[in-house]
């Protein structure tokens, strides 16, 4: 489990009704089984639209937290957190011009700690920065002043929390007065970490109370998960469609449709045609380069994305690779690997397409959705004309499959 713990005529009539009921059940099962089969009727179509954002000298293109902040008038801003400096960059999406660099402090009265795990920008006066060192979230304004600190140690039932983050593919969500946050597999649970780790929690911003979700990581890990690992075994992504959360786990073919309170869970088949076999790696090289190589070759599932404009979902997939030892595996990993595909699912989670993207050209880890379509970064370090001083994106639209 992944949820925490008379007359002859009458007889003839009943017989006929039972047979009719049986026939109806068979028909329903037949239709259901066929409706779960992929129907590849659509694809991603590359367009001529390309947008470019100039990068600060205090960051590289290896951005881990990319999101969109919309004002009440509909104006959109692209928000990036520097991977080097204590800075957040806010761009005007209509002009791609840098509007503001928000500088926050690591120490002192306004200090948020030595390292943050991404950013959630709600408005110019409400920006959340989760700490990567202690279980707390700082709220700052656009001047970098810390307005509040939100600690979370454990919930009322004694569930122990660990640090959270807000990154591309696994952001925090502010829903009404509650922050919905990711939790990774929890080492504070000891021998029960492989089975009892909650996928996340919510924090009531009025009371400060935190509550762990009943929904736990699906039991794909071995009981001795403390053994050496690549770090991708517990990789999780999620999106929110305004009603439910959808979770994608690296080594699980299924998606999980989860109610907002995380008490109702439905498994949804979402298998890629580019992954034949999916297994958690059991032999991990001790050499760092070889381990990173395995990370770049291992097949698994990536981010799940909700497109609210078209009411569809996109699931990123990493097929198996066979790479040369001459590769820079650290750069390749931080560029979203070499190849990837994206599964397209309709609003009812039927697979309607899957597109395999060309190798070493697009970044599976940097993307955003607008009313125009899906923008995917083409700032891949192996692309011959790549410019390290900018972050560029190509617009893709979904259309009829060729």
PLM features: residue spans?
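Beta-propeller fold detector
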Residues: 51, 98-106, 147-159, 211-218, ...
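C-terminal motif of bacterial Sec signal peptides marking the signal peptidase cleavage site
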Residues: 31-32
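Beta-strand-rich domains and repeat architectures in extracellular enzymes and scaffolds
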Residues: 54-88, 305, 313-318
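Conserved blade-ending motifs and adjacent loop-strand segments that build the rim/top face
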Residues: 110, 271-278, 283-286, 350-370
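Beta-propeller blade signature
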Residues: 194-208, 331-348, 389-401
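Loop/turn-rich, solvent-exposed surfaces of beta-rich toroidal or solenoidal domains
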Residues: 296-344
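Asp-box/WD-like beta-propeller blade repeats and closely related beta-sheet repeat scaffolds
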Residues: 134-135, 142-176, 182-189
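Blade-loop segments of beta-propeller domains
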Residues: 97-128, 132, 153-163, 357-363
